[in-house]
From Swiss-Prot:
This is IMP-specific 5'-nucleotidase 1. Allosterically activated by ATP. ATP binding is a prerequisite to magnesium and substrate binding. ATP binds to 2 of the subunits in the homotetramer inducing a closure of these 2 subunits and the release of the C-terminal loop, thereby activating the enzyme. Belongs to the ISN1 family. It comes from Yarrowia lipolytica (strain CLIB 122 / E 150) (Yeast). Its cofactor is Mg(2+). Mg(2+) binds at residues 152, 154, 374. It comes from the Eukaryota. The active site is at residues 152, 154. Keywords: ATP-binding, Hydrolase, Magnesium, Metal-binding, Nucleotide metabolism, Nucleotide-binding. Disulfide bonds: none annotated.
Amino acid sequence: MTSRYRVEYSLKQHRRDEFIEWVKTLLATPFVLHAGSTGDGRPGDENRSVVETRRRYAEIFYDVEKLIENQLYHDNNDSGERARLRQLVPTIGQFFTKLPLERAFYTQDEIRSISHRRFVSPSFNDVRMILNTAQVMALATGRQPLKLVTFDGDVTLYADGGNIDPDSPIIPVLLGLLRNDVYVGIVTAAGYSEKDGSKYGVRLYGLLEAIVKTDTLTEQQKNHLLVMGGESNFLFKFIAAENRFEWIDPEEWTLPEVRTWSQEDITSVLNIGERVFTNALTKCSLPATIIRKVRGVGIVPLPGKKIMREQLEEMVLAAQKTLETSKATGNVQFCAFNGGSDVWVDIGDKDLGVRSLQAYLGNITGTQTLHVGDQFAALGANDFKARLAATTVWIANPSETVEIIAELIDYIEHERQCSA
């Protein structure tokens, strides 16, 4: 029952990624025609089948790789609507780099045995992991060096509602990024407006302790950790010598378009979100309470209680649609998202959060930035908008974050050795 439920739930339209689904359909034909028979065959038949299947899969990824290059060309020449990939997948977003998908496929095939499988076709996760590997390969070998890696918090760096403890496996790879002169930015929905940054210090204390104590980082590298809280509302910089976060005045990093937002429009967005949650609380008799913050409003379960998944989805979609059709929101950007156990409407989004960091750190470009997150569905997910600002990798849990960043560091250091 659980497995069937999860499969049916994952097929909901708003939870799908059309590009990944499209690639899966391309891979279905070689799986059906070349993945091998189930009965006994002549000696060597199975090996020949694997070789042929791998070749066909690789050809498809090579062709998709060329389609992405074609889209990059058209986007750079203001003729994006003529890109073949955009015609085939109308919802496709922006690419910042080429993606070596064929090479990434061979790498992931060794790990996931995609070509050897006869009963399970290439899956959503197979394609997702190939895209992730291709992206970090491209960043490590690009003409412009990687300068900034940003992370979501919950489910990306630590378990939902958790912290980075001193023994967290995420710490060594984050230190590895800093050691390679890459800024680390945590762009989180957690919105703590207190200027001392102490609450972020509690959530990240294991990482902060490791940065302060390590002798493998320079003093400058130790200060290359930043936190953007509330999606795009509060910026803090770590001061290693004092083991604390320093609040950065918004005048130093707020983007020009955000400066035009009026407090009246911001209040209107939060009021509408609160009304949606209040209505759901009453109508569905939810065991929850509503929390109003400076730049966000959310509905969270009472201690020891749980809001069902369908109820969370109903609220996030209701909030999104209500806000989209309301003239009262003015030109304020907002983010309605399902946090896994709660639902929030925040002022701003991760597009603004990542771009604000890029501007603050010296106009870092999207091709020099990677965002790592777990929520990339088109609706109800707060990492989705980061695709407008930077390259991205889509992970499912903190363990995958460790793996992909370790992979990225390996590629960076290998590239440096080859060019030395």
